[in-house]
Amino acid sequence: MDEIIKYYNAQNEDDRLTIDRSHELEYLTTMRYIEKACASNSKILDACAGTGAYCFELALKGHKVIAGDLIPSNVKFIEMKNKKQPILDNIYTGNILDLSNFQDDSFDVTLCLGALYHLHDMNDREQALLECKRVTKTNGLIFVAYLNRFASFMNNFTYHPDNFDTIMQEFRTGNKEVFYRSTPVEMEQQASKLGISKLYNIGTDGVAFMYPEQLEGLSKKQYEKYLEYHFDTCEDEHTLGYSLHGLYIGRKQH
């Protein structure tokens, strides 16, 4: 976990989802599906809240939100934002592998939007999902973000074709430094095995990483047309693996 904390201490995570349109897609799509799937006035745990990209917006929409993150600097950032407009129910520093501060069946919705980017060990990945499931009410919703192995290969090969052996090794294992790349099928199988039934499995940013400059060059009207295309196709199982970021949305069965 120290390496993950070190990584995020060196990043400007607060700007990641707004830096350009290719990154904004991930945020817009994730919010679209949270709003689509969640009932109004839900009690939500944002267990990997980062710097608060989702928790504040969800609280403004009337949900009761508790936000936590592994990275102390991220939590401080959330606390500072919340002081300006107190709207979150609670804020905490914590590890997704241990949500023991919360009782079983506490939340209507649990968001795990980042932890699985970094957990290499399959037991840890299962533990994260099990903890999310434990604190979620029966028939409640669990949102799990993951990185896609196929898209990562395309991205790496596009910019670093001379490192093909390394790229292939990363593709076979899914591992690269502090990151782990999954596949849509792997994500579905793991969640299903743990009693989290699939509602949606979507590509949140599609292949936008392949043409960020073209997206930036679109007029507002053209960009709206692109968003329409993206939202129409983001659930297509034939192209899921070619989205850099995936989002599995499941329901707790028991």
Task: Locate each region found by the language model.
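Conserved class I S-adenosyl-L-methionine
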Residues: 1-50, 53, 57, 142-167
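A short acidic, Gly/Pro-enriched loop at the edge of an enzyme's catalytic core
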Residues: 100-110
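A short glycine-rich, Lys/Arg-flanked "PGG" loop and its adjoining helix->strand segment in the class I
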Residues: 126-138
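Short alpha-helix
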Residues: 178-195, 201
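A C-terminal cap/extension of S-adenosyl-L-methionine-dependent methyltransferases
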Residues: 200-254
